[in-house]
Amino acid sequence: MTGMKKGKNKKKNVKNDERYKELDSLISNDSEIGNNSRWGGAKRICKLIGNEMRNNIYVYLLSILYLCVSVMNKVFSKRTLNKIGNYSFVTSEVHNMICTIVFQLLYFIYRKTSNPASRNESQKNFGWQFFLISLLDASTVIITMIGLTRTTGNIQSFIMQLIIPVNMYFCFIFLGYRYHLFNYLGAFIILITIAAVETVLSYETQSDNSIIFNLIMIFALIPLSFSNMTREVVFKKHKINIIRLNAMVALFQFFTSLLVLPVYNISFLKEIYMPFSEMGTNINDGLRCLFYGQSTIVENCGVGMVKMCDQCEGAWKTFITYSFFNICDNLLVCYIIDKFSTMTYTIVSCIQGPAITIAYYFKFLAGDVVRQPRLLDFLTLFGYLLGTIIYRIGNIILEKKKMLKALNTDGSEAELTSIETSTA
């Protein structure tokens, strides 16, 4: 046994030594050429960037894929609400039905084509975990739908960046995560940027943007964060297929969305306030709008009015496109959390903020919700990118410290093993 343990320790030491020899060579090579060459610093930066990309190429490719899907998901979500924003509950429930059917079909195909060993996982019962995740997701979707009705595209992308400090706080409290000073600095820069943007916008007369609905959308980040943390805990303790997870969560979410209905009865939400007595009519009008293209609210509506004007013609095409990208988005989120962690997903998702803002500049992507570029947008993008880069630097430092600690621990174990072997 000691011989096998010693062999494993040797392999770990060799692997870690090779990686850190590569990093040390970058530093030593730079010291040789940096004194006499003005390009020494630039070469060192390029080599360090190349080393970072080479060691994490899979993560970056996955990030690009998730970025594209996530941006399209958010853009078509806004386009859907711009057409049928008066019927948020209807669109949410129909979307849940589509997700349930698609995920159940995918999981059925997976079980038929997979080996018998992987099917044993389906015998385990994760009912309460599925219910908790679905309840949190339902709360997130409903609250986000409400917030989006009076949140402009650019502000939407800005608010999504708040997920970084929100996830940091809850992961610190409940999952025991610890962070580097640069992580806190990066999150602080993002927070300051968001605060500055909201302050400027509060003095502007934007009838299609409401501070109250911005705050509602920010509040949706809390159940989203808890949902991601629950997924991480479940993935770490049990081996759950991500397709099955999404299928069961979508099924539960169809029913748990009913628990969030009282939100529509809050009187101060003037734009979407709907007493229980009018919900039946609203659901009927929403179904006719989505499936038959019949607009009901066409008078006394629009910018500055209590209700949005229905634009039901062709709304189902936009809605189906949104559902497709949302399904892909859910699968990628679960995969990233399963293979990495909640904070890895947070780092990847923070890139979508600037990307969404840019996407709203192009009419072929944003359609009727296209926005004109403003200086404030670019200043905000700079603040987000600066905060994101500093946050990533903190992660790199923490990863290096963790690997060095593991290397030292393996070295100590190897020495103890050799002593035990010699005394034996």
UniProtKB/Swiss-Prot annotation:
Positions of glycan attachment: N86
Record GO cellular component, one term: vacuolar membrane
Compartments in which it is found: Vacuole membrane
Chain ranges on the Cytoplasmic side, renumbered to this chain: 1-56, 110-125, 178-180, 231-248, 339-346, 399-424
Disulfides per UniProt: C289-C312, C301-C309
UniProt superkingdom: Eukaryota
Residues exposed to the Vacuolar side: 78-88, 147-156, 202-209, 270-317, 368-377
Transmembrane stretches, start-end: 57-77, 89-109, 126-146, 157-177, 181-201, 210-230, 249-269, 318-338, 347-367, 378-398
Biological processes annotated in GO: amino acid transport
Principal location listed in the UniProt entry: membrane
Topology of this chain in the membrane: Multi-pass membrane protein
InterPro entries the record matches: CRT-like (IPR013936), Transprt_Chloroquine (IPR017258)
Record's keyword terms, sorted: Amino-acid transport, Disulfide bond, Glycoprotein, Membrane, Transmembrane, Transmembrane helix, Transport, Vacuole
Pfam family, one: CRT-like
Molecular functions (GO terms): xenobiotic transmembrane transporter activity
Known role: Nutrient transporter. Involved in maintaining the osmotic homeostasis of the digestive vacuole.
Family: Belongs to the CRT-like transporter family.
Identification of the protein by name: Putative chloroquine resistance transporter
Organism: Plasmodium chabaudi
